[in-house]
Amino acid sequence: MKAIGIVGSPRKGGNTEILTKHCLKAIAEEGVETELIPLAGLDIKPCTACMACKTKETCPIKDDLMPIYKKMRAADAIILASPVYYGSATALIKGLMERAGYIARWNGRAFAGKVGGPLVVARRAGKNFTFAQLTLWFQILGFFIPSSTYWNVAIGRDKGEVEKDEEGLETAWNFGKSVAFLVKKLKA
């Protein structure tokens, strides 16, 4: 059993990564293997709508997507984490969502039946839209989306500031516990 946390922030070691590590720790405590996959520094281009993925489970764009897609395909649970940039998820995570989503969707709904959900970090506004944006991706692709004690959102702008948001940390922790619970039930 494995859960991966994909961090869509271009800032290494920032609030989104801190929150994702916190969530993954809760999952690991329940005996599920975890892996953090930061997209910072990677080259993830947007989808060009070439439709090559409709006939082959790959993308012809030459960048860092396919090794991550293979990890997504092998994982039992996927968490997508993004800070809010201008009221939306980052371009980095959206490029991954578009392309990995199309590849999976056109190739036997490859993510259907996996567990997944979002984590969002915001300075102030845009968190609800970004949370919905990420959640809808999971829903369209047939994921089981576990609950938490609130929306999986935390507050933080300056590096490390998210650690002061006790409710946000607790929500991410409880989400992680729900992810592990659901993965274990589905694998039983």
Where are these regions (language model features)?
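Cysteine-cluster motifs in flexible loop/terminal segments that predominantly coordinate metals
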Residues: 42-72
